[in-house]
Amino acid sequence: NHTSGLPTTPNGNFRTEYTDDELLGIIYKLDLNFDAGSRWRFSYCNYIVLGFLIKRITGEYYADFVTERLFRPLGMQTAQPIDDMAIIPNRAAGYDIREGKPRNAQWISATANSTADGSLYLSALDYAAWGADLLGRKAVKAESWAAISQPARLASGRIYPYGFGWFQG
């Protein structure tokens, strides 16, 4: 819940391919921004580490894990990890503003698209399926929703209104 102290990004080059061990090694060598549990600060590194934990515990990469446990049970037909090389009909691509003009977003490495910090394609219908499940709460166990809905408690006792991936309130 972003109380680890890990920096926001791993400071790597997102256009360079890394092995899992190389990327984890980059994160391992980073200095913490603060002592774990003392503050809250959003960090993509937390999600990258989460992806490695999912792989270590389940033997599955994040995208495979969420496909089997979330996308398929909810009937999300197009949800998939980002693959810049795949031909996806009607795909909406990202844009950057450079020199005041919109341009196609620059390619980033497949490594950056394989971690648990996002990097998914979903259609509007898939988002609707996800939203409907949020209301009905069928695909995610009740105890998981209970954990998700708990705000972060810092070592000082202060509460920060963010659960596991969700702002509270």
Name each model feature, range by range.
Residues 1-169:
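Short, surface-exposed loop or secondary-structure junction motifs
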